[in-house]
Amino acid sequence: MSAKAATKNATKVAVKAPEATTPVETKKSKKDNVMRGLRIEKLVLNICVGESGDRLVRAAKVLEQLTGQTPVYSKARYTVRSFNIRRNEQIAAHVTVRGEKAAEILEKGLKVREFELRARNFSTQGSFGFGIQEHIDLGIKYDPSIGIYGMDFFVVLSRPGFRVAHKKRAGAKVGFQHKIGKEDAVNWFKTTYDGIVIGGKK
């Protein structure tokens, strides 16, 4: 046998066939993928008083004290005569918070709920929401001139790469496997806050 042929055979022996990936390993690699990690995209805080006027202005002040941002007023979509609500009347105030401040306020709200939510608080799109009865439980000092207001928390989660769906130029859809489902949001809540979910399968 020539030296060239011997070298060729040795190379064949050295090359190993690729090892098959087991389903467990595939699941683990997806879990460890940084692109699969969840984060808070935004937190929306809403106070609905059901009427315009002084009560609504005071509710907006509560949101401003909590977030340091200027709230936006929401209008009624329909006329509800039984509640004296007119269409296009300002009846609620809301503010959108992002970044570290959103995480800080969310943790305060979950602490009021003792880090306990119901399965129905989570949507199939991976968002979740809950409410509290008294805003002073968030650490805001009670002001007799303002009163006490309850508020709703609405949390939108996202993954790295979600912004491509919102681009005006060269936008793209988020792949089905990359989308966030209810189970993803529930697991994120349990892992991040050591939370408890009551009711349902999750």
Swiss-Prot record:
**GO biological process assignments:** translation
Q: Which InterPro entries match?
A: Ribosomal_uL5, Ribosomal_uL5_C, Ribosomal_uL5_CS, Ribosomal_uL5_dom_sf, Ribosomal_uL5_N
**Matching PROSITE patterns, A to Z?**
RIBOSOMAL_L5
The role this protein plays is:
Component of the ribosome, a large ribonucleoprotein complex responsible for the synthesis of proteins in the cell. The small ribosomal subunit (SSU) binds messenger RNAs (mRNAs) and translates the encoded message by selecting cognate aminoacyl-transfer RNA (tRNA) molecules. The large subunit (LSU) contains the ribosomal catalytic site termed the peptidyl transferase center (PTC), which catalyzes the formation of peptide bonds, thereby polymerizing the amino acids delivered by tRNAs into a polypeptide chain.
Name the residue ranges with Low complexity bias: 1-17
Q: Which GO terms describe its cellular component?
A: cytosolic large ribosomal subunit; extracellular matrix; nucleus; phagocytic vesicle
PANTHER family registered for this protein in UniProt: 60S RIBOSOMAL PROTEIN L11-RELATED
Quaternary structure, from the entry: Component of the large ribosomal subunit.
NCBIfam families in the record, alphabetically? PRK04219.1
Indicate the principal place this protein occupies in or around the cell: nucleus
Please give the family membership noted in the entry.
Answer: Belongs to the universal ribosomal protein uL5 family.
- Determine if Ribosomal protein is one of this entry's keywords: yes
Q: What is this protein called?
A: Large ribosomal subunit protein uL5
Q: Name one GO molecular function term.
A: structural constituent of ribosome
- Organism superkingdom: Eukaryota
Question: Carries keyword rRNA-binding?
Answer: yes
Q: Where is this region: Disordered?
A: 1-30
User: Which key words are in the record?
Assistant: Cytoplasm, Nucleus, Ribonucleoprotein, Ribosomal protein, RNA-binding, rRNA-binding
Compartment(s) where it occurs, according to its Swiss-Prot or TrEMBL record:
Nucleus; Cytoplasm
